[in-house]
A protein has these predicted regions:
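A conserved ligand/cofactor-binding region detector
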Residues: 1-670
Length: 670
């Protein structure tokens, strides 16, 4: 795309984790990212920068100028490692800079000489921990501390590098916002706001007002979630301990914000508190971005609407010119051309290779909607991919699945709002139907799950255990053989997704409406010809706009209906059918080989917050009807393949090329 951009992240030694299912329970093991990949990285030790943690901040006035000094801090050295990335058929090469952390002196010789061998290495070990593991568990204070240190290392080292490079070229920072756009991708790099202020004020002697003007004009922010727990908030005590100067800057940002809000909303302390950067002993990362950034966007139209009308409404009302939507996109050359070469190659014989550069050229496939030979060839390619996945499942799960069955696929991280539980409850309902009426013909169905749960997320891990228990029950029951199979494929990752996604017939996108910001698995599956079965949530709404109701299977309440039901007072017992009640009793009776009391309780009691927080029970009957409808349509092979073709042809809008172009024009001014 010929865009002059650089990405920044951390050079993690280990990924999130390798997942193993042991006795039905997710176990986490180290996933060494550098073992094979470090060869592609180019270290630049001469461009290392210092990042400071802890200590004390001293402030004073000197000749009318505000001055600060930080003492007693821990110094960490961040070393950049560059990965060069070329585009498809492009002259541009972009750079991804990854930072590793270490101490200025990796070895304390004095401690070693005293015989204190552990202390001789301790400080360096603590520094290196910053770049050790992606997303360390944060359900304890040490995990929170490490995550905060990771975020500040990324932000401080990256901004120092950006300013150093800018000064080499222009010898001034006055024009920073004219030449540089810094984009905050979700709240993890939100510390860009106070860190850029620190650099401008403390290191380059700008006054506060001019520094704030530059910072606001330089920074922009994409929000990726409406989930409260993902809108990061740091305890003041932890924040102040680790980042004392950054905390004092946040205090000043908050003080000035409060002065403004008290002028605009003079009698509304509730609004002041909700919009505050610091309140209730927390530092709020999203509000930090909302206070500062010149552009703020959501990642689907529904998501942006929800941000503007609810979560960020007060900031939107204060200045709506900063808000816009840019729907997510996918790297379709990976997810179609690389992952599904048979389909990509066949499309080139039909419509040429123009779609390799312009995804919208896929629309030319529409002309073949009535061509029975083309439809047959598309089915043959899909079956070939299903045979490949079936072979993987046989090898890794020891389960033989029928490639002529429907491959009903739900692949994404495990979270209650994504409602893998809704899917597995339906499977148990179907299992009971088959057991009750063995004489009734049932079209063969294979349900395929792959998901990782966060290491500290108990209920998500319980749901994985439930899926595994259901798969053991179903796959070992001779009465349902040839009709029903359930598979949980462990250790979901990109390379595994490249095998699963091209083989999918149905794409499960079943989050409760209003909770999924966008989703991208829906787009990856769509461009590979899977037909979406989903709610009107996230980018599903825009998929529906592209393909129409007739080319997907919709169910469930809308976001407005969900909100209205909560306001009326939602009681899941009012939606509980005898059929679903029977399934929930199976969870607590031991019929699955173990009890899942907590999973059942999460739906019917307030043990884990509101009963059925994600309205699984309320949407169950609608979901069941959509599943039945999908199976019925699938048996009309021509009709279903036409739906598949329509999804491929109309998926071009969801290319990351389009979304990046929007960012470049509408936010970065490239």
């Amino acid at each position: 795309m010929e865009k002059p951009v650089t990405g920044f992240s951390i050079r993690y030694e280990f990924g999130i984790f390798r997942q193993k299912i042991v006795d039905g329970w997710q176990m986490e093991f180290p996933d060494n990212w550098l073992e094979m990949g470090d060869v592609w990285l180019h270290p630049r030790k001469d461009d290392a920068v210092e990042v400071r943690f802890g200590g004390q901040v001293h402030e004073w006035m000197d000749g009318g100028k505000f001055k600060t000094a930080q003492t007693g801090y821990q110094s960490v050295i961040a070393v950049p490692h560059d990965l060069y990335i070329s585009g498809y058929n492009s002259t541009a090469v972009n750079k991804l800079t990854l930072w590793s952390a270490s101490m200025p002196q990796s070895f304390d010789m004095n401690a070693f000489s005293r015989g204190d061998y552990v202390r001789a290495l301790e400080q360096n070990t603590m520094a290196e921990a910053i770049s050790k593991v992606l997303y360390p568990a944060d359900d304890h204070i040490n995990g929170k501390r490490l995550r905060l240190r990771q975020q500040y290392l990324l932000v401080s080292s990256s901004l120092q590098s950006i300013l150093n490079e800018h000064l080499k070229n222009y010898h001034t920072l006055d024009n920073l916002s004219d030449k540089v756009a810094v984009h905050i991708n979700d709240t993890h790099p939100a510390l860009c706001v106070p860190e850029l202020m620190r650099l401008l004020v403390d290191e380059y002697d700008y006054g506060w007002d001019r520094a704030w003007e530059i910072t606001c004009a330089t920074l922009s922010y994409t929000n990726h979630t409406v989930m409260a727990e993902a809108l990061e908030r740091w305890p003041v005590s932890l924040f102040q301990e680790q980042l004392p100067r950054i905390y004092s800057i946040c205090q000043e940002i908050n003080r000035r914000l409060m002065e403004k809000l008290q002028r605009v909303y003079p009698n509304d302390p509730g609004k002041w508190n909700y919009m505050a950067v610091i309140a209730n002993d927390e530092v709020r990362m999203a509000n930090l971005c909302l206070t500062c950034c010149h552009k703020i966007n959501g990642v689907s139209q529904l998501h942006t609407d929800i941000l503007e009308k609810t979560i960020f409404r007060d900031y939107y009302n204060l200045d709506n010119s900063r808000f816009l939507n840019i729907t997510n996109g996918i790297a379709y050359r990976r997810w179609l051309c690389q992952s599904n070469p048979a389909l990509s190659g066949y499309l080139q014989t039909l419509i040429g290779d123009g779609f390799l550069k312009d995804a919208n050229a896929l629309e030319a496939l529409e002309q073949y909607r009535g061509d029975l030979d083309v439809l047959e060839n598309l089915r043959a390619i899909k079956r070939k991919n299903k045979v490949r996945l079936a072979a993987y499942i046989a090898e890794h799960n020891g389960v033989n699945v029928d490639p002529d069955s429907i491959f009903d696929v739900q692949v994404k991280r495990l979270h209650e709002y994504k409602r893998q539980l809704l899917n597995v409850l339906y499977i148990l309902t179907l299992y009971n139907e088959i057991k009750d009426h063995p004489e009734k013909p049932v079209f063969p169905q294979t349900f395929i799950f792959a998901a990782k749960a966060s290491a500290g997320y108990y209920l998500a891990k319980q749901i994985i255990s439930l899926i595994v228990a259901v798969s053991n029950l179903v796959n070992s029951d001779p009465q349902v053989q040839g009709k029903l199979k359930v598979v949980f494929i462990e250790d979901y990752k990109v390379s595994l997704a490249e095998i699963i996604i091209p083989a999918a017939d149905l794409s499960e996108q079943i989050s409760v409406a209003g909770k999924e910001a966008s989703g991208t698995s829906n787009m990856k599956l769509m461009i590979n010809g899977a037909v979406t079965l989903g709610t009107l949530d996230g980018a599903n709404v825009e998929i529906r706009d592209r393909v129409g109701d007739e080319n997907m299977f919709l169910f469930g309440m809308t976001a407005d209906e969900v909100q209205a039901l909560w306001q009326r007072g939602y009681d899941p017992h009012q939606f509980l059918t005898p059929e679903l009640d029977r399934v929930l009793q199976m969870l607590t009776s031991g019929a699955l080989g173990q009890r899942f009391d907590d999973v059942a309780a999460s739906l019917l009691t307030p043990r884990f917050g509101a009963a059925d927080s994600y309205m699984t029970v309320a949407d169950f009957e609608s979901y069941k009807a959509a599943k039945k409808r999908a199976v019925e349509v699938y048996q009309d092979r021509t009709r279903f393949t036409q739906m598949s073709l329509a999804n491929i042809a109309r998926a071009g809008i969801f290319s990351s090329d389009r979304s990046v172009e929007q960012y470049a024009k509408e936010i970065w001014a490239l």
